[in-house]
Amino acid sequence: SYNNPDDELWKVTNELLLSDAVVIFGSIRWGKMNAVYAKLMERLTWIENRHTALGEKNIVENIDIGIISVGHNWNGEEAIKLEKKVMEFFGFKTPNDLFWSYQWTKKAEDESLSGYKKDGKDFDDEFDFIRIVKESIIKFSQFFK
């Protein structure tokens, strides 16, 4: 921003406006998207202000956006539904296939250490996550050789 020379929002904005589609990944903390996501959305309110408050063209109307979240025990689906509405309000296209949440249990009280340990194992079993990450790292490093 003009008043904060260390602000790097322009980097996010440039990539966003050059994209046909954007998928944001985040975690669910205490029933909501995490603080990093919240800060990003707060900083991007200027997008919505352009067409709502200032009557200018919606500069994101042709961009598909989605949000994928991972959480342990509470409110993941509801949080994603809310954030989809936020993206619609911003003026993005919001195809249902780009909004998804993984939640290990629906028991809000499950804060046990054993539950968190089992959560990670179950996630890996369901999505083969560790193997995919290892393969991706190898492919990425080979790309730069």
For the regions a protein language model found, what residue spans apply to each?
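Functionally engaged cysteine thiol sites
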Residues: S1-D7, N96, K106
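Helix-loop-strand module that forms the ligand-binding subsite of alpha/beta enzymes
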Residues: Y2-F90
